[in-house]
Amino acid sequence: HTQKSYKLIEFEVKIDQNFVYNKRADGLIISTATGSTAYSLSAGGPILTPLLEAFVITSLNPLSLSARPLIIPSDSKISVEVVENPEDTECFIILDGNEEIPLKGDSRIFYAHKSQSQFKLIHPKEHDFFEACRGKLNWSISQEGK
């Protein structure tokens, strides 16, 4: 730990302007299928196959044992409002571990939605998503010799 005191932040989450929940947690992860095998997975989120067009909303160390990740369609508009943030706790939006945007003053609400820009991931022809998962996540024993 550093000298700063880290405390839980309370979030209010809405999807397409519909209230979903309030949650107290260290943070909130919103990821695509591509990001679902990274930080979201480490926080207990599900793995989405690459062609699934969806968002995963995963709480980071939530106060509630009933907190579960939520999978929603990629055309959804997500709004997250920081309802309660202790004075001595800094709050940031961090994009893909690179860009850090502080939430200060009136900028307590942020929005997430599908971008109109697209990019293609390049894989070798022999790439197999499930084989990669088996290898990286040590899912099962080898099927060789059966």
Please name every model-derived segment.
Residues 33-34:
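Membrane-helix boundary elements
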Residues 1-28, 37-146:
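Catalytic phosphate-donor-binding core of small-molecule kinases
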